[in-house]
């Protein structure tokens, strides 16, 4: 028994003692340093790192054993049989082990820091490693493990590390034997670090970034720091500091021309003076190449000369005020979970650049080190964020406590001295690894973790480690005092426009302001982006914002019988707690198909804007580019159009200095235009770039140049025959027969040439399938906008030879409640069609009426829609920048925006007319003013009822909604209430619709 006890006490399992110890964060790891991969002398160090002879990538299938609980882990688990395999990198939940969980704020475990549940799930990874002694060390590198890792080589315990998104390096040389070796990594789902990693994401586990072994000489370069200091007239200084050994170095431009050669001794800083330096910015991502020779190793470093500072409350890069047109990004992919390959990361960043995004916040943890190299090359500013978020503290006493300095609320761990070292460690992991990346302009302490001594200490540590960048943190925007001394910018989330404007009026505050999260892009949104843009550009102290967020998060649930991916979200995985589809809040779908919200971002972030000049034919081109002449990179053509199509096409040359304007003349005589006429300027890429091809459409602007005449219905005189019975009114005019039900006060039939055009009665429509931003939807259901009874107070018919008029008074409501709407309507039927004029008075109990209009269920063969209005994609009063006014046509089946959680979609704003047609019949809709419409194969009831898009069932009819008005979509899912100017006016609405039926 004593032998067994001794074996257990010295077993691999016995070494697992650090994951609840906030002072034991990294055991047996090497010191933190800047990211680099050495190459062998004679190799090109700027090639793909996988080509380095000094790097051995261990990605691939590893042996795997999963344990539901650490209690089940054998004492000598490293010698158990590994029958299963799993890809590395990956997350084990994607391979049938354990299950994903989506939680936003709430912790996935009981709040009892630093302790975690006894039943911690464990994934044990194992693989062989061949070793031939050659005098060099073998350094095993993990770039990302969630949540912590215990490492063993052969029978020996090597070490432990936490911080999921930080690099951990172990010198495994002392534990290796010549020939075959066994590497075992035991990964725990939770550790004390879990309390600091409560990010809003689907919770997954495992080795999720690259694993590799570096072969390094005993005496080697351990670390180096590159600083660039800009001078005057194109001069600059390069400050280079090395640690570990002496080096020689050569700096070349991107053509390979040598700019400088120098040497540096271990621990020495060398300063190199340069002239005619090309500067790095998001618009001009010029990189020099620094080749570092250290013994028989060679290291390649790309250097961007740039500086970032605050000048009189303005963020400036290279001396120029900048605006961040940014987005927040998580590592999230439906097939690979947290693992982001080089190709996936590059595709994300290319897509951002193609949509005029110039900045990214790594919410809320450091990304792969390769990600930053891509940002350097493509040109994106980065807020680099520490792996820190503890907003789950707001829930631990059963209520939301968002007082950022309250120990009993969100700031609990920010004030807990047990976590002080852990919080500083996360900052050190961040800064030391990424310190040489020019794309990084802000260091961020983390996200939503309150404020206390630990955060102050973290900020001061970052300042000591790097004085060349700005320090950012959102959770102190409402505090004064110590935050002023360490935070260079004030940061906020989801402020409304008045809050932004009010910031400038604070006499005690003179720092820049950034919205590190704004315009929540969940579902059909964001809808107020243009307004924020206008405020950001109203004052230089506003340095822009970062839309939340880049992608919808999802773990697929399989495929439908038709092969369609079933994207899952919170609640689909059988979790104890979940936050539903709140993770579906991106500008792109999980597969990176753009939402219409991304198209909106592209247009709002456009580099050139056009307004009318003072004289006819003159237009003012204004650039929002800060470093580049827009005329050097963009071509411009224009189209003059009216409701009949394109009238004229031309091209213009232009020249605009950065942040400047110029006047362009386009000869045109507006007196010649009978119809409402528009000019649209289209700006395209002048040449190929790293992210787009020559001719790619970068942006556009459209202006009305002639008012023209409104769409009027031609008067047609035909004989009208009206017959009234106690229950019904029948009106016949030409080939059209209308039947009006007096009890329901509704048209129950419209026949043309004997063919029925209505599958259901024509209805008034007050409801829409709630968008994710429609947080007031519970009021809509309470008032029963979606499900109501109709009361008719009277129906009168007056008829003449060429006209029939039906006047009704009615109300809409539900049992128990007072009517939510009282309506008077006059229906006029004549040879030109059906004319509807109504006056609707609404109850003040309705919280933000979503729409008012009419709805028709038409036969399926009425499948083609043509309209003159905002298109070609969905558009709303506050979400239409990506659209332009024109004549568009589409099959109704193609007019559905397929949000993963079904909701209102594909409305079209600002329409002058709409026709819905079959092969031989056309139904034309107009209104007294511009209107919105929606044509869909799905009813709003179906969209509202189903939780996933793959559950939707098409209606037996095509559903046509013609709206006097549709409320905006906003971003209220996690942002301010919809602005009043985008709401429907109440309590009284006067609306006018006209329906005309004709033969094609």
What are these regions (language model features)?
Residues 86, 94-98, 103, 144, ...:
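Beta-strand/loop-rich accessory regions of lumenal/periplasmic or secreted enzymes
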Residues 5-14, 30, 48-49, 63-69, ...:
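Accessory beta-strand-rich segments of carbohydrate-active enzymes
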Residues 2-50, 88, 103, 156, ...:
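Extended substrate-binding grooves/exosites of carbohydrate-active enzymes
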Residues 94-101, 106-115, 172, 176-246, ...:
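An acidic-aromatic loop/edge-strand motif
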Residues 199-220, 562-620, 624-632, 639-643, ...:
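Catalytic cores of secreted or luminal carbohydrate-active enzymes
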Residues 177-180, 241, 246-309, 672-673, ...:
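Extended acidic/polar, glycine-enriched regions
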Residues 151-153, 234-262, 270, 618-652, ...:
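Beta-strand-rich binding/interaction modules
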Residues 2-37, 45-49, 158-159, 182-215, ...:
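Glycine/proline-rich low-complexity spacer/linker segments in large multi-domain proteins
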């Amino acid at each position: 028994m004593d032998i067994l006890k001794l074996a257990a006490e010295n077993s691999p399992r016995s070494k697992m003692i650090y994951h609840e110890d906030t002072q034991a964060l990294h055991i047996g790891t090497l010191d933190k340093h800047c990211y680099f991969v050495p190459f062998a002398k004679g190799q090109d160090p700027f090639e793909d790192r996988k080509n380095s002879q000094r790097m051995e990538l261990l990605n691939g299938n590893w042996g795997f054993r999963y344990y539901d609980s650490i209690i089940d882990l054998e004492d000598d688990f490293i010698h158990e049989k590994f029958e299963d395999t799993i890809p590395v990198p990956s997350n084990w939940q994607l391979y049938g082990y354990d299950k994903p969980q989506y939680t936003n704020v709430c912790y996935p475990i009981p709040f009892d820091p630093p302790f975690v549940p006894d039943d911690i799930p464990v994934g044990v990874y194992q693989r062989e490693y061949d070793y031939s002694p050659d005098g060099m060390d073998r350094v095993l590198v993990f770039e990302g493990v969630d949540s912590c890792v215990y490492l063993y080589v052969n029978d020996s315990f090597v070490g432990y590390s936490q911080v999921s998104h930080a690099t951990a390096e172990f010198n495994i040389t002392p534990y290796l034997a010549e020939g075959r070796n066994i590497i075992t990594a035991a990964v725990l789902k939770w550790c004390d670090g879990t309390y600091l990693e409560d990010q809003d994401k689907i919770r997954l586990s495992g080795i999720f970034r690259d694993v590799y072994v570096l072969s390094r000489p005993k005496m080697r370069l351990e670390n180096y720091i590159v600083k660039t200091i800009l001078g005057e007239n194109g001069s600059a200084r390069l400050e280079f500091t090395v640690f570990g050994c002496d080096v020689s170095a050569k700096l070349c431009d991107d053509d390979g021309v040598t700019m400088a050669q120098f040497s540096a001794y271990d621990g020495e800083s060398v300063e190199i003076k340069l002239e005619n330096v090309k500067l790095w910015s998001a618009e001009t991502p010029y990189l020099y190449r620094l080749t570092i020779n250290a013994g028989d190793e060679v290291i390649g470093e790309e250097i961007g000369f740039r500086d970032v500072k605050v000048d009189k409350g303005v963020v400036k890069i290279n001396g120029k005020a900048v605006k961040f047109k940014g987005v927040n990004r998580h590592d999230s992919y439906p097939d690979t979970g947290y693992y982001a390959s080089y190709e996936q990361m590059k595709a994300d960043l290319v897509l951002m650049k193609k949509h005029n995004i110039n900045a990214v916040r790594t919410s809320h943890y450091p990304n792969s080190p390769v990600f930053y190299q891509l940002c350097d090359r493509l040109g994106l500013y980065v807020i680099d964020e520490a792996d820190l978020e503890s907003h789950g503290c707001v829930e631990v006493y059963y209520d939301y406590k968002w007082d950022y300095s309250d120990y009993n609320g969100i700031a609990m761990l920010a004030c807990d001295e047990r976590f002080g070292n852990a919080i500083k460690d996360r900052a050190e992991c961040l800064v030391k690894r990424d310190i040489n990346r020019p794309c990084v302009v802000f260091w961020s302490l983390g996200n939503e973790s309150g404020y206390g001594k630990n955060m102050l200490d973290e900020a001061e540590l970052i300042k000591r480690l790097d004085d060349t960048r700005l320090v950012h943190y959102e959770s102190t925007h409402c505090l004064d005092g110590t935050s002023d001394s360490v935070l260079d910018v004030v940061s906020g989330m989801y402020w409304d426009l008045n809050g932004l404007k009010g910031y400038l009026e604070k006499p005690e505050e003179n720092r820049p302001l950034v919205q590190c999260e704004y315009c929540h892009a969940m579902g059909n949104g964001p809808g107020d982006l243009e307004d924020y843009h206008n405020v950001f550009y109203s004052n230089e102290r506003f340095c822009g914002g970062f839309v939340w967020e880049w992608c919808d998060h999802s773990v697929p649930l399989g495929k439908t019988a038709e092969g369609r991916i079933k994207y899952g979200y919170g609640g689909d995985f059988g979790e104890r707690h979940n936050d539903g589809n709140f993770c579906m809040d991106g500008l792109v779908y999980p597969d990176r198909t753009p939402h219409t919200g991304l198209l909106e971002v592209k247009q709002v972030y456009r580099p050139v804007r056009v307004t009318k000049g003072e004289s006819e034919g003159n237009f003012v081109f204004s650039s929002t580019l800060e470093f580049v002449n827009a005329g050097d990179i963009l071509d411009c053509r224009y189209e003059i159009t009216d409701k009949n199509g394109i009238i004229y096409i031309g091209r213009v040359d232009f020249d605009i200095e950065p942040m400047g304007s110029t006047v362009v003349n386009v000869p045109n005589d507006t007196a010649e235009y009978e119809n409402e006429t528009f000019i649209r300027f289209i700006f395209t890429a002048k040449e190929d770039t790293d992210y787009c091809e020559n001719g790619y459409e970068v942006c556009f602007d459209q202006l009305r140049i002639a008012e023209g005449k409104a769409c009027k219905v031609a008067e047609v005189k035909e004989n009208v025959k009206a017959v009234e019975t106690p229950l019904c009114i029948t009106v016949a005019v030409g080939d059209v027969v209308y039947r009006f039900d007096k009890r329901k006060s509704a048209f129950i039939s419209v026949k043309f040439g004997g063919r029925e055009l209505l599958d259901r009665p024509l209805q008034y429509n007050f409801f829409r399938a709630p968008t994710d931003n429609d947080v007031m939807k519970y009021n809509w259901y309470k008032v029963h906008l979606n499900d109501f009874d109709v009361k008719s107070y009277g129906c009168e018919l007056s008829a003449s030879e060429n006209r029939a008029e039906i006047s009704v008074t009615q109300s809409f409501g539900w049992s128990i409640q007072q009517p939510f709407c009282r309506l008077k309507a006059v229906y006029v039927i004549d040879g030109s069609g059906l004319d509807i004029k109504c006056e609707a008075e609404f109850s003040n109990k309705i919280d933000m009426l979503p729409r008012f209009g009419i709805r028709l269920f038409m036969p399926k063969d009425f499948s083609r829609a043509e309209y003159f209005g905002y298109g070609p994609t969905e558009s709303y009063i506050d979400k239409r920048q990506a659209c332009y006014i024109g004549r568009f046509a589409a099959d109704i089946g193609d007019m559905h925006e397929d949000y993963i959680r079904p909701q209102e979609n594909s409305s079209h704003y600002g329409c002058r007319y709409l026709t819905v047609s079959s092969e031989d019949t056309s139904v034309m809709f107009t209104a007294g003013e511009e209107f919105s419409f929606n044509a869909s194969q799905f009813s709003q009831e179906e969209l509202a009822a189903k939780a996933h898009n793959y559950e939707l069932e098409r209606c037996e009819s095509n559903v046509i909604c013609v709206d006097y008005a549709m409320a905006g979509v906003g971003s209220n899912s996690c942002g301010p209430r919809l602005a009043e100017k985008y709401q429907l006016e109440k309590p009284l609405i006067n609306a006018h619709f006209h329906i005309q039926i004709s033969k094609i």
